[in-house]
Amino acid sequence: FETFAKTLARRLETEGRADVRLAIGAPRNLRVKLNELRDEGRQLGAIATAGPAGMEVIKAVPEKYPMFQQFAVLTPQPRKKSTFFTLDNFKNVTQRVVVIAIVAIGMTMVIITAGIDLSVGSLVGFSAMVGAWFIKERVIAAGGDPAAAGNFTVYSGFAVAILCAGLIGLFSGALVAYCKVAPFIVTLGVMMIARGMAEQANGGFTVSDTQLPAGFRELNHGTLIGIPNTVALLVLFYLAAHIFMSKTKYGRYIYAVGGNMEAARLSGVPVAGIILLVYTVCGLLAGLGGCLEASRVNAATTVMGTGLELEVIAAVVVGGTSLFGGSGRVFGTLIGAFIIGVMRSGMNQLNFKDPVQDMVLGAIIIIAVLLDRARQVGLWERLLKRGSPKAA
């Protein structure tokens, strides 16, 4: 499917199509691109889909997008064999997993402290919009030519976006640590606030690729000594997180807070400071995730990151971190992120619709929590003892 999409995009560009938009992933990504065209007042000449799930979106276009009435529909030739177990599909899965995996590092730390952060998806969308808007405004201030903007403009915009997301994470952590408000309530409220701010940025309109410098896409698509930037960032952050969690006293403090907060406090652990730290880190990494996602599609939309918190939490719990706090490993989270990514890829190839995919991920979270709870109460040990033969 992705090979078809990329090949078709290249062919249309060589035929002189001035504006080709590529939507890869779940059907909701196709709706995002349609929203971009609508917001920018552009016309829809042709639309391509690689499966029935995308066709459902296309059938609804005349009703939901009255401005798009006449357009061609292109479909691929029937596949002779599955492309699921191919190197290209693995690369595509890795590309999509990077944002989930990086954001999940911060979520792992939060959950180990027996907390939760429901705002990460909205922070991804917020930081994507803020970063792209800042860069667009700098381009306008410099004369309005995106081609004349340098890398400093791009990376200063990314830095502003990450810093803003980190400050929001700091705010969430302060409410949890010092005001003793339940993490679920705090981050639910922050989720709504951040989504509202994302929708207000740039007047609620998409920041399109025509308004951004060419260097904007380099963060996600560029390479470092031959290694894709996304892979380099993934390896760097996971190694750093592993060392921090397993080799430093602050990592041990995080586990102590989640294991028994009162005991940790009596032992001299700065509980409030640790809670503040993990929520701030989670916000910063969500900000980086938003920059990576915007760079991947070379644009920023107000709906970016919608539902991402579900995938991030699923990656953490599938990776073995207990939602009840006190245990978990960052490399387990990385494995969990790839499991979720592979499942998403498989469901896309099987043409599962977005609601079905969300139901599957929700079920995975519930099952993982139930299994963890069974482990905590010693259910497996009791079952093994009951099933073992009694001594004569």
Model-derived segments and their meaning:
Residues 63, 266, 270-273, 347-392:
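Cytosolic-side transmembrane-helix boundaries in multi-pass membrane proteins
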Residues 155, 184-248, 274-277, 296-304, ...:
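Transmembrane helix-bundle core of multi-pass membrane transporters
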Residues 86-138, 174-181, 320-330, 363:
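Single transmembrane alpha-helix segments in multi-pass membrane proteins
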Residues 141-190, 335-336:
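Alpha-helical transmembrane segments within multi-pass membrane transporters and channels
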Residues 279, 286, 296-362:
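Transmembrane alpha-helical segments in multi-pass inner-membrane proteins
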Residues 110-127, 175-189, 253, 300-310, ...:
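Short, non-helical or kinked segments that cap or interrupt transmembrane helices
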Residues 240-280:
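Membrane-helix/interface signature in polytopic inner-membrane proteins
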Residues 3-10, 16-104, 139-154:
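Membrane-interfacial amphipathic/re-entrant helices at transmembrane-helix boundaries
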